[in-house]
């Protein structure tokens, strides 16, 4: 108990030292392993995180521990062994040392947050000419790391992306790296930034960036033209494969070819980066072998931008627009109002800014009231937010201190079963999804299991006031 208290005090001081965002992103899974004589041993889930903490924060942690207990002479970081199988998402702990922006102490950071959405401003000119990818979908030069706005919702994904783009031969990799989020939150921007930065590097790697739809078209064309072997050979020799919109990969034969390509690249230690609008285990249309291989890497979810991120995106967009019209002015009050009310995605924020830009050309004095009229179709006020099952799972998992993967796993312990049943109940009451579809989103369960969970929670709510209040709280959190 004394050692637990020591760890709690050190954790609190570490959080105060590095800031809550950095602490949550990188130290959230740090645990006390043991204390023996003069040595404190802390554990983390992955080798990546162990190496990163040892290189950057071990001295600070040791100092904090010794300030709490002068008898401690040494702090060691261990990698704890998993006690149960689960899908390897591990977003917080799966990013290596290149995540410089995420680990800079708050006092050395820019006052403005730097969050990531495709609507951001113009990227800085590259230090060297960017070569073209071998083939594939076109790259947009605006979508570099410099124009990607970073914040708490995408910091881990950005750090992983930078690590891959900057990694040299033999570097530690997250393979495959799987980035998932709803539409308009910056996945495509981030993937293109990886490709652009990698192509710009002195290593001159062989890079292929393409969408799943382009992959299907290219393979179908190659098969039709009896050129499939040539296409496979060209893909075999690449160093970095980046696939966007994986949820659109359809067709048994195409998926079979992609599975072979994926296996070949991963077995050859070539880097693969994939993005989709849902987690790999939720891509029900994919061949099970493809899903399994994608789940074998690191999956990182990007969430929606907060107010500070949205405001920064609008400021950058205004700065970019001023390059064409130096006299352009949109008051900060207007930008703040838009950032506060247009909350769905970066694409909608871009649409809102374009509306302002257009209207300002013949209505130079826009008021808040006029902005509300113009952007009424983009503002969520007064309209119920469309809730996704993924949102429900995330909020419920966080509330009950379990992982989202545990909710969809086969574990039947009490600490998992009750949150799982509550999440199923909320999925039925807050979304239009059917019992079978909800069951599939919860690890492929039968519709009768979902029906039982819904009825069970309904019974408990009627008899348990505390649970009823909990459910109402969860509904509010989900709809925020």
Curated annotation (Swiss-Prot):
Residues the record lists as binding ATP: 184, 186-188
Gene3D superfamilies named in the record: 1.10.1750.10, 1.10.8.60, 3.30.300.180, P-loop containing nucleotide triphosphate hydrolases
Region annotation (Domain IV, binds dsDNA) ranges: 361-480
UniProt keyword Phosphoprotein, yes or no: no
Main subcellular location: cytoplasm
Annotated GO CC locations: cytoplasm; plasma membrane
Record CDD domains: Bac_DnaA_C (cd06571)
Similarity-based family: Belongs to the DnaA family.
Described purpose of this protein according to its UniProt entry: Plays an essential role in the initiation and regulation of chromosomal replication. ATP-DnaA binds to the origin of replication (oriC) to initiate formation of the DNA replication initiation complex once per cell cycle. Binds the DnaA box (a 9 base pair repeat at the origin) and separates the double-stranded (ds)DNA. Forms a right-handed helical filament on oriC DNA; dsDNA binds to the exterior of the filament while single-stranded (ss)DNA is stabiized in the filament's interior.
HAMAP family: DnaA_bact
Protein name: Chromosomal replication initiator protein DnaA
Organism: Rhizobium meliloti (strain 1021) (Ensifer meliloti)
